[in-house]
Amino acid sequence: MAHLQRTFPTEMSKGRASFPKGFLFGTASSSYQYEGAVNEGARGQSVWDHFSNRFPHRISDSSDGNVAVDFYHRYKEDIKRMKDINMDSFRLSIAWPRVLPYGKRDRGVSEEGIKFYNDVIDELLANEITPLVTIFHWDIPQDLEDEYGGFLSEQIIDDFRDYASLCFERFGDRVSLWCTMNEPWVYSVAGYDTGRKAPGRCSKYVNGASVAGMSGYEAYIVSHNMLLAHAEAVEVFRKCDHIKNGQIGIAHNPLWYEPYDPSDPDDVEGCNRAMDFMLGWHQHPTACGDYPETMKKSVGDRLPSFTPEQSKKLIGSCDYVGINYYSSLFVKSIKHVDPTQPTWRTDQGVDWMKTNIDGKQIAKQGGSEWSFTYPTGLRNILKYVKKTYGNPPILITENGYGEVAEQSQSLYMYNPSIDTERLEYIEGHIHAIHQAIHEDGVRVEGYYVWSLLDNFEWNSGYGVRYGLYYIDYKDGLRRYPKMSALWLKEFLRFDQEDDSSTSKKEEKKESYGKQLLHSVQDSQFVHSIKDSGALPAVLGSLFVVSATVGTSLFFKGANN
């Protein structure tokens, strides 16, 4: 039976009320990972449609986002789920080819695509959920990729500005929170340096099967153009009078780094370089108008430069800093690299390490090889941003825990709805944010879990699950709430302070447990073990555990 061995920290015992007034709690998504319906509504083809269909072997399960989790047809029921678990914000992205099928505004706007996003936004607002809209989450129209190489060309800057302008015009009367770019580091490095993600470009010395690309060069060009496109979009945004109290920024995805050998000055300095190359690469220009000095020194003339006018547009172009945080690693300084085979990784002169010099991991390993549950890393990043960039407003635009397919993690191996590891991960990171706000003075203003639903996870396909809701891909994409969803529902209740009596707490706990039990009784996992004779024990333990967990208790782990 599960062993309950931890209570909430006292300072978080009031749940949502422990955070500043107006603090946003939400979930995050992206168009290609959620929507499906790739051939509906006059949608054009994106680079990810092309990549997943042309190179299925680069997706772990050879899948694609053609259907994804069918948010296109099910958004109303999914928004009800957000409301049910007391979320007050939702981060979604616009699919560029859904509103501009041919990439350029002068080639035609899809009014069907515009209507879809208008309907989603209106449904969110009707449920008192604040939309945070991302303009670019990697699904550039394939037409622009074919025509001039997408973000490899400066031509993309004008086309992105026109696309962003369309979004502001059509949705800005109801949307005040915007994000221009999601994880430009991933898009540049994975798309143009390692070739793992669309469009899959890199040098032959990185991947012998590569069709085209130039590692150590193209990623810097792509990121440069992304930053210039961002600046142009922000200039348009700030001239839109109908956008009231608007805020716009970029969602970065830094890791936190600790030195492989704390006694080695090179490893300590390597951590600083690694932060410059991952976070500073795209954050520094928007705050200071130029790339970090470490990058300019290391990359040399392969790193593009900004004109004075471009720098002026970039400085102050973010109203908040978006942070997508998942994990932390150790960094070991590299003494020598081959200058004839440059990559982004060798340019920073470090290796990422899963263990330190003593063979110890930075924290408990999560659901993938490079994932570690280390909330302290998030707190350190928040303090780093405050110290380095003058304490700007911060949104945690993504944070989540992925588990590989149907991996078993405890006694509850028969049912993934008992996601104790995810629950622990989320609670730990919310606590780290709380500490950063109240003890460190960091201006964190929102937290978005990745993600509401299991979904298409890029190169991992459907083999990694991050959702608060389990998607049954074998049974019509049915949704089942996991323990983490019900825990968040309880944590985010608006009536925390008015519901403190013992009888009401016990009533809530019992209801909480029954909800989870009901959500999984008819799932494929329960059906699959009926013949094993283990069903009564599994469901019995499930009920006992879930009925016991309320606002004051949560799972630390499950032990026999």
Swiss-Prot record:
Record GO cellular component, one term: chloroplast envelope
Annotated PANTHER family: BETA-GLUCOSIDASE 26, PEROXISOMAL (PTHR10353:SF226), GLYCOSYL HYDROLASE (PTHR10353)
Gene name of the record: BGLU26
Catalytic residues as annotated in Swiss-Prot or TrEMBL: 183, 398
UniProt protein name: Beta-glucosidase 26, peroxisomal
GO molecular function ontology, one term from the record: beta-glucosidase activity
pH-dependent activity: Optimum pH is 6.0.
SUPFAM superfamilies in alphabetical order: (Trans)glycosidases
